[in-house]
């Protein structure tokens, strides 16, 4: 079943550290079945707290999504992301 990972950037705390995350996350995608659907496109919050940006990634199934998220390369990228911003990450299965 298709599975999606949704990331919302709640607050940037250190832009220089966050800038290092992008290349690391890109490298971590190699060898994984993921499709970016939304990458910081124009957005509008209709309910809830404001966000700075949204990323939505599509995976063929939950196992593939968690395999990428917990991979050594993305774990290192994620730790870098934590140095530069506060995010919310959600995994959700599609229909």
Predicted features, each with a name:
Residues 62-90:
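C-terminal structural segments of small proteins and small subunits
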């Amino acid at each position: 079943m298709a599975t999606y990972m949704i990331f919302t950037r709640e607050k940037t705390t250190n832009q220089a550290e966050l800038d290092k995350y992008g290349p690391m996350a890109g490298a971590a995608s190699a060898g994984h079945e993921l499709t970016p659907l939304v990458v910081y496109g124009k957005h509008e919050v209709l309910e809830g707290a404001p966000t700075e940006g949204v990323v939505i990634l599509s995976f063929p199934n939950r196992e593939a999504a968690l395999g990428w998220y917990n991979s050594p390369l993305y774990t290192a990228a994620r730790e870098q992301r934590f140095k530069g911003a506060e995010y919310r990450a959600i995994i959700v299965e599609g229909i």
